[in-house]
Amino acid sequence: VNADSGRMNGEYKILKSDGTDFTGHSGGIVSFGRYVYLTDGYFLYYIPQIALSGGSKNIRIEGEIRLPVSASFITVFDGYLWAGNFYHKSYANNFDVSVKDGYGKQYRTLIAAYRLDAKKRGGIRTSDERGTREAVIYAALAAPDEVQGAAFLPNGDVHLSCSYGRGVMSSQFLYSYPLKEECDGVVSVGKRVVPLWFLNNDRIKRSLSAPPMSEGVVFKNGRSYVIFESAAQKYRDTAMDPTDCVWAVNW
């Protein structure tokens, strides 16, 4: 969709690199440099941005990179691609790392930082693990449950979009940029030990309630823009206050 006119530029069907249909979750999507990135579980897929020119068509994934932490949302900031998992208590084993902050609160959402590198294939620094290219994690943020989307403001503040359930109000949180401070500790992810910061009450700046089923978020031109899943065909008849609009948040 053209951001200025509001008109649709094209609709794209995504194919795997072998030409078969891509049927993954596509929990997160972001564009940076030469590529559009999307996630599905433990894999990050990349598509050349140039493939999206010329209107509606099929586009093919160029390659994939394995992730050490499952990813349901992604964003880009300060030279890193940040990807995190979705955790809710009803999914007992849906996490890779469990850590406690200084107050004893448990965190099972981990937002991992992977270094962007235009010189590398796929634009991400990787190592060769088990014959598969795996993204190298450099740092991590421990975040609250139910994160559906994340975005960084220009000053580094972190906006988290959190929701779960068709009849439960979603929450939007704004945290101060943690990496300008000394890390809160370290965390082991695979074979690496990386610095860890908590997005907890010590760093929260603002919070607000929003309609149910908030999903991805992006920051542009001074505002956060949040999309919702409630008006999707699958949910619109049963969700509370379904909305088919993109909502703007002026922090």
Residue ranges, per PLM feature:
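Beta-propeller blade signature
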Residues: 1-5, 47-60, 96-122, 169-193, ...
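Blade-loop segments of beta-propeller domains
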Residues: 2-34
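Surface loop/turn motifs at the tips and blade-to-blade linkers of beta-strand repeat domains
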Residues: 12-21, 62-67, 138-143, 199, ...
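Repeated scaffold domains used in trafficking and secretory/extracellular systems
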Residues: 20-28, 64-76, 144-149, 209-219
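Residue-level detector of Asp-centered blade-edge/turn motifs that repeat once per structural unit
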Residues: 31-33, 76-78, 152-155, 219-221
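Short glycine/acidic-enriched loop and turn motifs that connect beta-strands
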Residues: 43-45, 88-92, 164-168, 231-235
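Loop/turn-rich, solvent-exposed surfaces of beta-rich toroidal or solenoidal domains
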Residues: 138-207, 213-215
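Blade-level signature of beta-propeller repeat domains, shared across WD40, Kelch, NHL, RCC1
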Residues: 214-251
